[in-house]
Amino acid sequence: MNAETQTTAQLAIPGINTAQAIARFSGDEGRYRYWLAEFVSHGPAAATQIRLAIDNGTRDTAVKLAHALKGRTGMLGMNELHSIAQSLEQCLKNGEPSTLWLEELESTVQEMSTAIASVLGPIKA
């Protein structure tokens, strides 16, 4: 087993393609870990902000927030969550009901945050 394989194995997080994501970070695992920790710290709040924007009738803001979360999750290798954020963004853009996608997004963000925190350990705010 080479060093790269060991690193990827140590970062095995359910629902995240860590090998793909670390490659996006040019192999810089430290930088990748930093952004994973940022997601744990800010991902749930981002989902809450999307809900608040929808509840307040500011659909354009909700679209922008969903788009930003979609980009972040794609960069981090969270393929399922990326797909959910993309579907939510599309529903919002089309003026379609988004409740089911929003609920799925919120629960998946929480699941991902918990899974990441269990692998990374305590996250400093």
PLM feature spans:
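Two-component system phosphorelay core
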Residues: 1-125
